[in-house]
Regions:
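Histidine-/acidic-rich catalytic cores in large beta-rich domains
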Residues: 1-401
């Protein structure tokens, strides 16, 4: 989405019909994470000196953050979404657990047994790289491409299991978009664990969502990509309807919900939308896009969340816009992130993802949530004063978040 140089920040719209509750978010490459109330007032913050890429509130009420990669991270390609560590913070910001892996990226899940799943990159064998289709080549392409891996570690950080995507993906089905580079194959950007333990993974570069059998590692279900070439493929995998999507998930109704970013669409302009499909029939159940098509677009990051009352919280990530829509597409709540952070694209308000939390959620029991604790900050935001952070050294990042 394009925006005015002097645009409003903070809460810009609220009306009846919102699901209410608190909203958790952080700025991409910032050093803070915030909880805001329905009025857009900051009621709690965490800070971390290593920077923050992504945050999630755990079942125990702690915050699990993914930090920025270290500037001197030798042996790691500088790819968008890269991280350095997962760090668990309590309500006061104290570190209670951490795991460092400079190949981790984008997303992670704390399991009920205390183990943690996360996405990582690994260089693929030359024989595999030679078979990857699509993308455009440059003279400076690396000899080996990066492939996606899912790792499971225990509470001590010991590796228990590792799934290498290239051992299960089909070269003819996972074809890189022709407008993307040949540096990596799939660029996974979201990971969700299904009720039966299987993994739902979004693959950005091939515009595909896959369901992985957690036991065998096989691909059980697939949506999108370049596979819908004939009637057999269409029946097997569904229509190719996605374009560099993020945040694939399964709402309580069993459907699949996705933020479809919309870069490099085959026909027409680039625009974003939220899409919900029935995974059995691939039929569209619900979708959201702006009637003024170009008014809703994020070329990177972004997400969505189905709320208890049926509304959907949407993170239009590149512009830092968080908004809630009803089933009938009415916007009932909107908030613009007040932070701008140094980035490869200039000062950026980007938010990777946001999460709505009910006011009576037991995970908040240990928090003294109060706008009064951040009175001066809330006053400045209400007055339209942009919040900035000092410049800091950061490795170059590809625009493929």
């Amino acid at each position: 989405m394009a925006w005015l140089t002097h645009r409003p920040i903070g809460l810009t719209h609220s009306e009846s019909g919102s699901d209410g509750g608190y909203t958790l978010f952080s700025s991409v490459r910032g050093h803070h994470a915030s909880i805001i109330d329905p009025q857009g007032q900051i009621v709690h913050q965490w800070h971390h000196p290593e920077g923050i890429q992504h945050v999630k509130l755990l079942a125990n009420g702690h915050l699990l953050i993914q930090t920025l990669p270290p500037a001197d991270a030798a042996g790691r390609e500088k790819i968008g979404g890269s991280a350095g560590a997962m760090i668990e913070l309590d309500a006061e910001g104290n570190t209670v657990w951490e795991h460092r892996d400079i190949t981790q990226h984008h997303d992670y899940v704390r399991l009920d047994n205390g183990n943690t799943l996360y996405l990582a990159w690994e260089l693929m064998p030359q024989a595999i790289c030679a078979q990857v289709r699509g993308g455009h080549h440059h003279d400076d392409d690396p000899e080996l491409m990066w492939g996606d891996v899912v790792r499971e570690i225990d509470e001590a950080g010991e590796l228990l299991h590792e799934w290498r995507s290239w051992e299960h993906l089909d070269f003819n089905e996972e074809v890189i978009c022709p407008l993307e580079s040949h540096k990596e194959w799939t660029h996974a950007n979201s990971l969700e664990v299904m009720p039966n333990g299987d993994w739902l993974i979004s693959l950005r570069l091939t515009s595909t969502v896959i369901l992985v059998d957690a036991g065998s590692g096989d691909i059980k279900w697939r949506w999108g990509g370049s596979q819908a070439h004939n009637e057999h493929d269409l029946k097997r995998w569904g229509p190719a309807e996605l374009s560099h999507q993020h945040n694939a998930q399964r709402p309580a109704n069993g459907n699949i919900l996705v933020f479809d970013n919309g870069c490099h669409r085959k026909r027409g302009p680039s625009y974003s939308r939220i899409v919900e499909i029935n995974p059995e029939t691939y039929e569209f159940v619900w979708s959201y896009s702006n009637p003024t098509v170009l008014a809703f677009y994020s070329f990177m990051v972004s997400g969505c969340q189905r709320l208890a009352n049926g509304n959907t919280l949407i993170t239009e990530g590149a512009s830092g816009r968080l908004f809630e829509v009803t089933v009938d597409h009415q916007v009932v709540w909107e908030y613009i992130s007040p932070w701008t952070i140094p980035s490869p694209f200039g000062p950026s308000p980007a938010v990777f993802r946001s999460y709505r939390i009910k006011a009576d959620d037991p995970r908040l029991a240990g928090y003294a949530l109060s706008a009064a604790n951040y009175e001066s900050l809330n006053t400045a935001i209400a007055a339209g004063v942009l919040q900035t952070e000092p410049d800091y050294h950061e490795p170059e990042t590809q625009p493929t978040l």
